[in-house]
Curated annotation (Swiss-Prot):
Region (Disordered): 180-205
Main location: cytoplasm
GO biological process: cell differentiation; spermatogenesis
Composition-biased stretches (Basic residues): 186-205
Chain spans, region Required for interaction with CBX5 and TBPL1: 138-185
Coiled-coil blocks: 17-166
Taxonomic lineage from the root: Eukaryota, Metazoa, Chordata, Craniata, Vertebrata
A Gene Ontology cellular-component term: nucleolus
Function: Binds DNA with high affinity but does not bind to TATA boxes. Synergises with GMNN and TBP in activation of TATA box-containing promoters and with GMNN and TBPL1 in activation of the NF1 TATA-less promoter. May play a role in cytoplasm movement and removal during spermiogenesis.
Family under the similarity heading: Belongs to the SPATA24 family.
Assembly description: Homodimer. Interacts with CBX3, CBX5, GMNN, GTF2B, TBPL1 and the polycomb proteins PHCF2, RNF2 and SCMH1 but not with CBX1 or PCGF2.
The protein's name: Spermatogenesis-associated protein 24
GO molecular-function term, one example from the UniProt record: identical protein binding
Length: 205
């Protein structure tokens, strides 16, 4: 427990020590008074001189006066102690009340922090899920792009093969046409030679 303002453990201990010392003094004084009374009783039983009796009586009066002062001082110190204890009790209750209010506020703050932390974790998880989904979509897109590139290459190769085939086909056609022309010319030439020979033979007859 925190030490109240205006009051310290050392101060409390000093007051208690002073009260104990006062109680010891009172007990000693009461013991001395008791002894003096016994002396007075003995003086009554055994005759003593007037001077001795007056001296003892004076000392008894002084001790009674000192005893009364000590009791008054003790009462004042006890009153101070009770007042101080009352202040300590009030301050302790106030401190306990403030402690409960602080713990309640701290609990509320912790709860809010946990809620915010939970929201933050949820947002991070959501962002990670979105990022993962985007990465997957990018992978799929890259795969499609690669497929398209491969198809484009295949189409390009097929076009080139087709061009080569068309070129070979044209060459072949040209060659066939050329051969046909050559053969046709040879055929015509051979036919002309035969006709010329057939015209020459009748003349010889």
């Amino acid at each position: 427990m925190a030490t109240p303002l205006g009051w310290s453990k050392a101060g409390s201990g000093s007051v208690c020590l002073a009260l104990d010392q006062l109680r010891d003094v009172i007990e000693s004084q009461e013991e001395l008074i008791h002894q003096l009374r016994n002396v007075m009783v003995l003086q009554d039983e055994n005759f003593v001189s007037k001077e001795e009796f007056q001296a003892v009586e004076k000392k008894l009066v002084e001790e009674k006066a000192a005893h009364a002062k000590t009791k008054v001082l003790l009462a004042k110190e006890e009153e101070k102690l009770q007042f101080a204890l009352g202040e300590v009790e009030v301050l302790s209750k106030q401190l306990e009340k403030e402690k409960l209010a602080f713990e309640k506020a701290l609990s509320s703050v912790k709860s809010k922090v946990l809620q915010e932390s939970s929201k933050k974790d949820q947002l991070i998880t959501k962002c990670n899920e979105i990022e993962s989904h985007i990465i997957k979509q990018e992978d799929i897109l890259n795969g499609k792009e690669n497929e398209i590139k491969e198809l484009q290459q295949v189409i390009s190769q097929q076009k080139q093969i087709f061009r080569n085939h068309m070129s070979d086909f044209r060459i072949q056609k040209q060659q066939e046409s050329y051969m046909a022309q050559v053969l046709d010319q040879k055929h015509k030439k051979a036919s002309g030679t035969r006709q010329a020979r057939s015209h020459q033979h009748p003349r010889e007859k």
